[in-house]
């Protein structure tokens, strides 16, 4: 199983960073592997919530059925994913207080028969850069002073 991690400092209070990191409807704006939701998104997320999406890594698409197995606002959530071909994915999102706001982190675990051998190494390498780009996108999307993309950008009026 490939295990990948990444984190980035975000100039937002933890509660605001959490709001954005846990907003499934906004994944298309910053999470590079997310293509489209294939199920209706719930109004509220809780342990046991199930959603389906299409993800893409290195030009390879897979339909993933995600189950929320841990949901602890504003600290983190874990989604276990089962994909076509026995692909297994675990996505762990974490938000921690930091000196200048928050640290947002993602851990991704990949497994299953389709990801053994050379193809697994290629996917893991591609996913490593996707995690880094996604975290940079997160900062750009949710901290830029553009009310059209991020509301107040975490600024308190």
Question: Each PLM stretch: what is its role?
Answer:
Residues 1-46, 156-157:
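Hydrophobic ligand-binding cavity/cleft-lining segments
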